[in-house]
Design a protein with these regions (language model features):
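A short alpha-helical cap/connector motif
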Residues: 1-126, 133-155, 159-186
Length: 186
């Protein structure tokens, strides 16, 4: 659909419904915790700008960011691999992807992301890390070898809103001279 009005309207409807759901959940783990629309748009723009071909998303939830990535992937000829530990949320994400006709560029993987990362030999030119923050540093052990050396990008969500929880990951990346890092207030 490439960011057509019907696509954007449906994304907005989904986002609003996810926000309402989250407001009813006392336990943080039960919330969908999708990224903000501005962040999602930034991700889609980044994929288009760098003409990404292999995209990895760690933390599908209900697929809000996945939909944005998949729309951009259709434009660039990319494939999105998205990881989610919760099968029910993956089924929701698949439903929305089919509804919005972007499912043809998405591979859904259900299970612990750590297992996927340990086994994967793939290189990705765009990686979105938006999962349980206490696992980020462990994931970095594998992600640093999965980022395409020529122009690959890793986007880490919650760097500002949960700075203390991701500080060790950010410090680890900053110490590695193979990578550059910056924080964007989106």
């Amino acid at each position: 659909m490439s960011l057509s009005n019907p696509f954007l309207l449906r994304l907005n409807e989904l986002y609003q419904s996810f926000i309402k759901f989250d407001a009813t959940q006392c336990d943080r783990v039960n919330r969908y915790r999708n990224i903000e629309p501005e962040s999602a748009l930034f991700l889609a723009m980044q994929v288009r700008i760098q003409q990404s071909k292999k995209i990895l998303e760690i933390g599908t939830s209900t697929g809000y960011s996945t939909l944005w990535l998949a729309d951009a992937a259709q434009v660039t000829g990319a494939k999105v691999t998205t990881l989610e530990i919760d099968e029910k949320r993956t089924l929701q994400a698949k439903h929305y992807a089919q509804e919005l006709q972007v499912d043809n560029v998405i591979d859904f993987w259900v299970g612990d992301a750590q297992n996927f990362l340990e086994q994967s030999q793939e290189k990705y030119d765009f990686i979105l890390l938006d999962a349980e923050r206490n696992a980020y540093l462990n994931y970095w052990t594998y992600l640093q070898h999965m980022i395409e050396p020529k122009g690959g990008v890793l986007v880490v969500d919650n760097v500002i809103s949960h700075a203390a929880e991701v500080k060790s990951l950010i410090n680890e990346i900053k110490q590695d001279t193979r990578f550059m890092t910056t924080t964007l207030p989106i």
